[in-house]
Amino acid sequence: MADRGDAARRLDHAAARHLSGAFGLSRAALQRLVAEGRVRVNGVAASRPAQRLQAGDAVDLDLPPPPPRPAPSAERLPLEILYEDDALLVVCKPPGLVAHPSYAHKTGTLLNALLWHAGDRHAGEPSWQPRLVQRLDKDTSGLLVAAKSADVQTALQSARAGFMKEYLAVVWGRPVPARGTIDLRLGRDPLDRRRVMARDGGAAAVTQYHVLARSRGDARGLSLVRCELVTGRTHQLRVHLAARGWPIVGDQAYGEAPRARLAAVALDRRARAFGRQALHAWRLRFTHPRSERVLQFDAPLPADMAALVAAAGMERALPQVAVS
């Protein structure tokens, strides 16, 4: 369904806007679909890609079945493993590494590295298939669990596993109160399906937060925040913090820096130039599906985020393990 943002747009532009992320469809591919009679507007076959839409127009696409996606290949990539047994692994993902192959990132992912690890350890064909239990955004660093079998993956994703995930974030502003709960429903942005927004009727999403420190000498400044996910929605922390007026430093999608500059000029420049969202999954706790032991893992901040925290004079407030 065309929305207000599609009014007067070309058909191919509007369709690409909604479908490029989810289906990997380019404008050229959409133009071919129009030429093949596979696109209908309000029940009538579209005559040309440049046809203009109106808000409320119903657009139907008859998509051909996608070609089978090749199985991810093993790649020798750096891999930081904190724990491994015959059922699972716990790894620390660096910033900039995609967790799972996608249309945009077919190689060079964490899963490719895990496949190499499986084969390398077992001399040839892997005897187990890594299955990521949860994911992190490309530019979010920190802890992830990979199961070695489907039954372990299912068990870890059940409520019995009791997953607890904590993050450290550097945000713009001074969260008030210093400790609290953010309870905002989240859903896809109707104008950009790649984004998430707080909206009525969305999925329940709850975040608990605690301000650990504030940067020195500025009424606005930066804050170091510890967050626990009660639920695990896509982009939950990024959207929740931004919705409260405390966007994460470096977040290109949700974290636009405030126009007002910080009094500390060097810190302001460093924060505005930070190349990714300053978000790190630092603690993970869960019940092992076989031994039923409660396992907890901590990961120190990566160097870029640790330097930002230190520049803001907040390093003493870090949980002890988060200091390299």
Language model segments and positions:
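RNA pseudouridine synthases
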Residues: 1-191, 216-218, 301-315, 319-324
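Residue-level recognition of short loop/turn positions
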Residues: 36, 42, 231, 290-291
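Structural motif
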Residues: 57-58, 233, 293
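Short coil-to-beta-strand transition motifs
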Residues: 73-76, 164, 198-207, 278-279
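Pseudouridine synthase
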Residues: 99, 106-118, 148-153, 188, ...
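Accessory recognition modules or surfaces
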Residues: 192-231, 244-265, 269-270, 295-324
